């Protein structure tokens, strides 16, 4: 066992003395057992994590029953909703790398034999997953579960996005202060990851397809007794995974990655999933290119439409309809789309996991013969505005905006854009451009939920597009095109755009262009001053110096001194 490094032999007497002092060692026989890290992310700032302390307790109890010695430790976490619209959002994506590094540090420093990872919200799941693949010791994931959708006294279904959009409605006088307060009070009824197919739930669903989590991980509600049982089962499974030395890189193959992307496209997951899955693939040293996504999307039908694409369906409805296993089972009917032979943490193949799944509600999970669209709910656009690509959640775009051409309304920061939108400077037909908000420019590639919600709340969702080198919340809807690469801070073409330039978006044609000649773009770029970093000290300054482009997952580049020669 790896943990023998810190517990076996007379030389390790000091180590054992310290371990005993933790109160976790119950006797000498514990030194013969695997040491299992319970990698929790409990904190009281994130509603999706406020209940995880109890799940950690259950995991420790079950690991000990199964023959292991549990050691719980925590990672940090950022609530994207609370961090939204201010400097805090610049720390959100950057926290993914901190989480990965911290999990790596604890597991390696203490020679843990395996991990039970308990994430839930946006950057915590991919951060833990990146660490798992980096250290490559047996790991199983079990998330905290989704929040229930809210309901107003009148019976209207609401969620967090309803509140953001209600702010825009309040700014126009469409709703009263009292109506806004009613939505605010009822949108988030309890703990759990926000209730739609936003980033957190998207990643927890993808964990099933990747093979790292048990069936049900993505959809069983936080308050459901089945969630506690899922934690118990996962905590028992880790002992078997350790004994058989089944490691993350044994599970995550290129085929498993393609399975996850197919699921992502079929359920219209958050655009952030592409960013995170590319980063995960990088840690696994898998050869996968951003440009491959459109080919897979073209053969994957969009069969499960969930909030924010529609307010009629939330994650709890997907669970009642059969969950992720039912979606995968439906997709398995398409010859060659899924590789059902890939292994999973259940000890069975993906095909064995889903063979008995069935769709229980065709209004929630459609058949492959009757999809919302024949192609997936996410795609990549290319053109002279985004030579290295840009991402859009097609499943949340209204029909009138699938093709759009209009004058650019350019803002060099999210704050300026919000002020412009709320101040009435954006009109029907415009293309709002928010730049210098990419991985380096932001820094941290902040999400644009506030401006997109303002556009929707002001009734412009069917007539205004938004383009950015930043990101979007999984809760954004409308013609929201993000991850524009290269970003403005490295003098990508988006930096050349000027107010009034015509921008043309053709989503079915997968293109995004500005009606400016290549020569004019080059001249404008040549005349730009050098980008001045917005933050010059602390973690974000270091992050901005090392982060790479969105089309490679916004991972941190390896310092030159660490590169193999």
UniProtKB/Swiss-Prot annotation:
Record-listed [2Fe-2S] cluster binding positions: 121, 194
Record's GO cellular component terms: cytosol
Cofactor binding comment, as recorded: Binds 1 [2Fe-2S] cluster per subunit. This cluster acts as a Lewis acid cofactor.
Keywords: 2Fe-2S, Amino-acid biosynthesis, Branched-chain amino acid biosynthesis, Iron, Iron-sulfur, Lyase, Magnesium, Metal-binding
Entry GO MF terms: 2 iron, 2 sulfur cluster binding; dihydroxy-acid dehydratase activity; magnesium ion binding
EC number: 4.2.1.9
Sequence positions bearing N6-carboxylysine: 123
Sites where the protein binds Mg(2+): 80, 122-123, 447
Reaction(s) catalysed (UniProt annotation): (2R)-2,3-dihydroxy-3-methylbutanoate = 3-methyl-2-oxobutanoate + H2O; (2R,3R)-2,3-dihydroxy-3-methylpentanoate = (S)-3-methyl-2-oxopentanoate + H2O
Pathway(s) annotated for this protein in UniProt: Amino-acid biosynthesis; L-isoleucine biosynthesis; L-isoleucine from 2-oxobutanoate: step 3/4; Amino-acid biosynthesis; L-valine biosynthesis; L-valine from pyruvate: step 3/4
Keyword Iron included in the entry's annotation: yes
Pfam families: ILV_EDD_C (PF24877), ILVD_EDD_N (PF00920)
Keyword Transferase: no
InterPro entries: Dihydro-acid_dehy_C, DihydroxyA_deHydtase, DiOHA_6PGluconate_deHydtase_CS, ILV_EDD_C, ILV_EDD_N, IlvD/EDD_N
Cofactor or coenzyme needed: [2Fe-2S] cluster; Mg(2+)
Subunit structure of this chain's protein: Homodimer.
Family: Belongs to the IlvD/Edd family.
Name listed for the protein in its UniProt record: Dihydroxy-acid dehydratase
Species this chain originates from: Chlorobium luteolum (strain DSM 273 / BCRC 81028 / 2530)
Gene designation per UniProt: ilvD
């Amino acid at each position: 066992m790896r943990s023998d490094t810190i517990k076996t032999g007379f030389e390790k007497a000091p180590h054992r003395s310290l371990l005993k002092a933790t109160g976790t060692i119950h006797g000498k026989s514990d030194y013969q057992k695997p040491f299992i890290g319970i990698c929790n992310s409990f904190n009281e700032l994130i509603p999706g994590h406020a209940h995880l302390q109890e799940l950690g307790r259950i995991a420790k109890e079950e690991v000990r029953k199964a023959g292991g010695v549990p050691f719980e430790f925590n990672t940090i976490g950022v609530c994207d909703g609370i961090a939204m619209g201010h400097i805090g959002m610049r720390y959100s994506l950057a926290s993914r790398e901190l989480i990965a590094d911290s999990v790596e540090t604890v597991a390696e420093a203490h020679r843990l034999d395996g991990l039970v990872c308990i994430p839930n919200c946006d950057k915590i799941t991919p951060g833990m997953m990146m660490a798992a693949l980096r250290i490559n010791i047996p790991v199983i994931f079990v998330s905290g579960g989704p929040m229930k959708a809210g309901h107003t006294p009148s019976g209207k279904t609401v969620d967090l996005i309803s509140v953001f959009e209600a702010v825009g409605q309040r700014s126009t006088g469409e709703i009263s202060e009292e109506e806004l307060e009613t939505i605010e009070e009822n949108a988030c009824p309890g703990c759990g990851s926000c209730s739609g197919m936003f980033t957190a739930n998207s990643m927890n669903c993808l964990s099933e397809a990747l093979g790292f989590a048990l069936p049900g991980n993505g959809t069983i509600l936080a308050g459901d007794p089945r969630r506690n049982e899922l934690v118990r089962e996962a905590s028992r499974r880790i002992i078997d995974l350790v004994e058989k030395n089944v490691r993350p890189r044994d599970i995550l193959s290129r085929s498993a990655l393609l399975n996850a992307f197919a699921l992502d496209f079929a359920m219209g997951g958050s655009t952030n999933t592409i960013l995170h899955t590319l980063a995960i693939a990088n840690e696994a040293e898998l050869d996968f290119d951003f440009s491959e996504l459109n080919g897979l999307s073209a053969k994957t039908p969009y069969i499960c439409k969930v909030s924010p694409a529609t307010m009629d369906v939330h994650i709890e409805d997907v669970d009642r309809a059969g969950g992720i296993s039912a979606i995968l089972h439906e997709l398995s009917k398409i010859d060659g789309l899924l590789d059902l032979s890939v292994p999973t943490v259940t000890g069975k193949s993906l095909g064995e996991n889903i063979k008995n799944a069935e769709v229980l509600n065709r209004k929630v999970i459609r058949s492959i013969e009757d999809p919302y669209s024949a192609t997936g709910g996410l795609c990549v656009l290319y053109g002279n505005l985004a030579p290295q690509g840009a991402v859009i959640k097609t499943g949340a775009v209204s029909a009138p905006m699938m093709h759009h051409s209009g004058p650019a309304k350019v803002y060099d920061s999210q704050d300026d854009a919000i002020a412009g939108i709320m101040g009435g400077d954006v009109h029907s037909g415009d293309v709002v451009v928010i730049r210098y908000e990419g991985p380096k420019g932001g820094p941290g590639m902040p999400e644009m939920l506030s401006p997109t919600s303002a556009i929707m709340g002001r009734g412009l969702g069917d007539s205004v597009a938004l383009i950015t080198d930043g990101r979007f919340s999984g809760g954004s809807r409308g013609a929201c095109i993000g991850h524009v690469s290269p970003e403005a801070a490295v003098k990508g073409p988006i930096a050349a755009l000027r107010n009034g330039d015509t921008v043309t978006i053709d989503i079915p044609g997968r293109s995004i262009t500005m009606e400016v000649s290549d020569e004019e773009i080059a001249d404008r770029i040549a005349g730009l001053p050098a980008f001045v970093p917005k933050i010059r000290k602390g973690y974000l300054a270091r992050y901005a110096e090392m982060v790479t482009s969105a089309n490679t997952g916004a991972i941190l580049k390896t310092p030159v001194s660490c590169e193999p020669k």
